[in-house]
């Protein structure tokens, strides 16, 4: 194993200097690989998120991980030093931890703690400084509870909500659902998803309710308020890859009162559900946040935030989508647009990836391409060349896409980290690695060390005979010669504030 791992370490970044050579921005330095961390055996379906855990002024990286599905590992949740890439701490898991971290100082030590979930069902709070377990959700405790007895499956990503029990700490909103043993198209064994609020200090459940339609849920809930309003809204979804679903809007008040039956259906889909979390952004220019979603059946919708009428729709027949939209100012107006990629065919016989940019104003297609094979990471966004129009950074896999995920494995595999310049309709490579793949992890971009330049942190996974199995992984930090001149609006999975809300006034700089 070690021979195979070390074999590929020097195999990358043939084009890391391209950013300097093409003079994206005036710069005093070239791109450089700051560090590379190899980890044998394990892999990840999580995405990196950052917080300064050792109080050294540089953001550190947390990611969920594990071995293959249903396997235990002592490397289930990992924290890496942002300066060196060395492991700060690790937490064990009994199954894959595929969620991405939520940060909140729950123990009052001035260092943000980590909340993260995964399969079987796992939801943990971890001391951000030491890696010690603060609390863990215990499903056995609730086997006789009329609602929580259904929360025995996957914990997806969580988001912070305002303090609900007056202990001075924000609390956790999350969803549990999705029975991996349920057969496709069958309703048997598909328990209702459970939306819940937990005390961030103790893990006690403050409130919970089942999905109004009784269906499963895989979607991370999105929590927001409209400008000028104190009402707190929750958008959540139901259904799966082969099961009908609905998109709902409700209020935190209704969840706290166990009245999710009062939630309003704002979209529905037959034969597919809502899996990717929606993006919240103003596309009408009325100052109110709208809801932009895409179903697993690749029907994109913009829904008005005031009265919930459908503003526009766009459907992509013969494709599927589990990837979130990344919003940005990609076209020549001041209305945010929405970029993602969708998969040709039907899982597991997906035969390629289509990159799609939807104009936020009217739902028209502003850009479309087909590079690489199917993957389930999401884009991140920044104006790399400082021309006033954003670019998107994505991870793609190159292999024989016609093989899909169910047939014999591809003999060769290449992972590329690329950026798309929509104004010039060009794609450029940031990093390229033979023998690696990335099926799930979204990159992170931001100023990790506060030096005024953009960093990118991303994961790659050693190619295995089974595309979805793990053989080991590596995490890499590259320092780009791109000055951070403006707010980073969408620099990680679900945005730079990790909540799915596109808000230029609250983005990270």
Model regions: which residues?
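Bacterial Sec-dependent N-terminal signal peptides
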Residues: 1-29
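Beta-propeller-forming repeat regions
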Residues: 22-509
């Amino acid at each position: 194993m070690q021979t195979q791992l070390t074999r590929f370490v020097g195999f990358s970044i043939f084009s890391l200097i391209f950013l300097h050579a093409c003079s994206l921005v005036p710069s005093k330095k070239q791109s450089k690989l700051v560090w590379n961390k190899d980890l044998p055996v394990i892999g990840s379906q999580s995405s990196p998120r950052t917080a300064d855990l050792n109080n050294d002024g540089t953001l550190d990286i947390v990611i969920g991980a594990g071995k293959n599905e249903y396997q235990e590992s002592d490397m289930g949740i990992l924290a890496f030093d942002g300066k060196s890439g060395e492991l700060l701490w690790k937490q064990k898991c009994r199954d894959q931890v595929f969620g991405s971290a939520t940060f909140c100082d729950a123990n009052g030590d001035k260092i943000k703690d980590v909340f993260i979930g995964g399969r079987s069902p796992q939801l943990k709070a971890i001391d951000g400084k030491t890696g010690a377990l603060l609390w863990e959700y215990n499903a056995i405790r609730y086997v006789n509870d009329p609602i929580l007895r259904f929360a025995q499956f996957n914990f997806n990503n969580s988001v912070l909500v305002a303090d609900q029990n007056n202990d001075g700490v924000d609390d956790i909103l999350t969803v549990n659902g999705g029975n991996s043993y349920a057969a496709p198209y069958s309703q048997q064994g598909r328990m209702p998803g459970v939306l819940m609020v937990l005390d961030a200090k103790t893990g006690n459940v403050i409130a919970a309710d089942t999905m109004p339609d009784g269906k499963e849920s895989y979607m991370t809930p999105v929590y927001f308020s409209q400008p000028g309003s104190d009402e707190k809204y929750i958008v959540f979804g139901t259904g799966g890859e082969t099961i009908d679903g609905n998109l709902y809007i409700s209020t935190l008040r209704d969840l706290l009162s166990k009245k999710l039956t009062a939630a309003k259906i704002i979209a529905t889909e037959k034969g597919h559900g809502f899996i990717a979390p929606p993006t919240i952004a103003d596309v009408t220019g009325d100052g109110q946040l709208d809801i932009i979603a895409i179903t697993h059946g690749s029907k994109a919708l913009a829904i008005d935030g005031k009265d919930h009428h459908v503003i526009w729709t766009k459907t992509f027949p013969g494709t599927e989508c589990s990837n979130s939209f990344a919003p940005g100012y990609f076209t020549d107006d001041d209305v945010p647009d929405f970029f993602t990629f969708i998969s040709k065919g039907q899982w597991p016989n997906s035969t390629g990836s289509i990159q799609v940019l939807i104009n936020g104003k009217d739902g028209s297609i502003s850009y479309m391409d087909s590079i690489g094979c199917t993957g389930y990471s999401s884009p991140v966004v920044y104006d790399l060349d400082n021309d006033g129009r954003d670019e998107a950074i994505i991870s793609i896999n190159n292999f024989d896409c016609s093989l899909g995920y169910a047939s014999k494995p591809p003999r060769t595999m290449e992972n590329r980290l690329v950026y798309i310049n929509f104004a010039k309709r060009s794609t450029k490579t940031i990093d390229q690695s033979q023998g690696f793949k990335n099926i799930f992890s979204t990159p992170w971009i931001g100023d990790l060390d506060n030096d005024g330049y953009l960093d990118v942190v991303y994961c790659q996974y050693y190619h295995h005979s089974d595309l979805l199995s793990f053989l080991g992984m590596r995490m890499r930090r590259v320092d780009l010669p791109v000055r951070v001149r403006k707010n980073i609006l969408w620099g990680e999975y679900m945005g730079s504030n990790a909540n799915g809300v596109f808000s230029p006034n609250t983005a990270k700089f």
